[in-house]
Swiss-Prot record:
Pfam families: Adeno_E1B_19K. PROSITE patterns: BCL2_FAMILY (PS50062). Keywords: Early protein, Host-virus interaction, Inhibition of host apoptosis by viral BCL2-like protein, Modulation of host cell apoptosis by virus. Belongs to the adenoviridae E1B 19 kDa protein family. GO terms for biological process: symbiont-mediated suppression of host apoptosis. This is E1B protein, small T-antigen. It comes from Canine adenovirus serotype 2 (CAdV-2). The lineage of its organism: Viruses, Varidnaviria, Bamfordvirae, Preplasmiviricota, Tectiliviricetes.
Length: 170
């Protein structure tokens, strides 16, 4: 169950990469369609993202000094991004793009490495959400099947026993 159709890491990476670019022809036609959607969400939600992670937050200092893996895992886990308009996954993609767009320019991390340093833990988080949703769906389906088969058995027993309320079968 993957409503965003993120089949693999390369697709995910291309969407994040495209969403960091300015709106226009290049982003719209050279990257997956979701990149343009995510890029537009970043623009719309930028104020809210700055409230979640203000400019004076210690996270930006960690990025500046090159500490990325532990800090990303902490931010990704702690941030409550979804709201009534955005699903958790879309808000998450937009937040990742926001982080890349606002990465401190004086960071020790080379610009070429930033995308993968952000996308790898983000992709792992997305996979966990997808697998969890799939497990919940499978569990709900099996519960519904069990309830349905139990009701069918009760109906069969009632018909065989002749104690049905239906006048034709009574």
């Amino acid at each position: 169950m993957d409503p965003l159709k993120l089949e693999n890491y390369l697709t995910f990476r291309a969407i994040i990469r495209g969403s960091t670019l300015s709106p226009g022809f290049f982003r719209r036609w050279c990257f997956p369609a979701l990149a343009d959607v995510v890029g537009n969400i970043v623009v719309q939600e930028e104020g809210r993202f700055w409230q979640i992670l203000p400019e004076n937050h210690a996270f930006w200092g960690l990025l500046r000094r090159g500490f990325t893996v532990a800090s990303f895992t902490e931010i990704i886990t702690a941030a409550q991004l979804e709201n009534e308009r955005l699903s958790r996954q879309l808000a998450f993609l937009a937040f990742i793009s926001f982080l890349l767009r606002n990465w401190p320019s004086d960071s020790l991390v080379p610009e070429a490495d930033r995308l993968d340093l952000v996308c790898a833990p983000a992709w792992s988080r997305m996979q966990i959400w997808t697998q969890t949703a799939r497990l919940i769906n499978d569990l709900q389906d099996s519960v519904l099947e069990e309830q349905g088969s139990a009701e069918e058995e009760e109906c069969e027993e009632a018909l065989l026993a002749g104690d049905s309320d239906d006048p034709l079968f009574g």
